[in-house]
Amino acid sequence: MAAPEGWAEIDGALERTFELETFVDAIAFVNRVAELAEAENHHPDIRIDYRNVTLRWWTHSAGGITDRDVELAGRSGELA
């Protein structure tokens, strides 16, 4: 299974860092990802570092990346 464009497979997860214009933009992006995650009942690890947001999608029960992670990584990338 291939990682969506812009995403890297790191330590068994799909990871990508997004650089937003401002801290407020970064928080707004995180909120959009949170809404997606809640709607799908599947939640990424999220790190906020000023204007940079790093997302990591993986499935705990599978011990790695699943098709669902690939789908949600792609969808969350569209929210940036």
Which residues does each PLM region occupy?
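Preference for bulky hydrophobic residues occupying beta-strand positions
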Residues: 16-18, 46, 55-57
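C-terminal structural segments of small proteins and small subunits
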Residues: 51-79
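N-terminal first-folded block
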Residues: 1-23
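A short N-terminal helical cap/helix-turn-helix that marks the beginning
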Residues: 3, 37-47, 74-80
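Solvent-exposed alpha-helix faces
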Residues: 31-32, 74
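Amphipathic, hydrophobic secondary-structure cores in small proteins
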Residues: 23, 27, 39-53
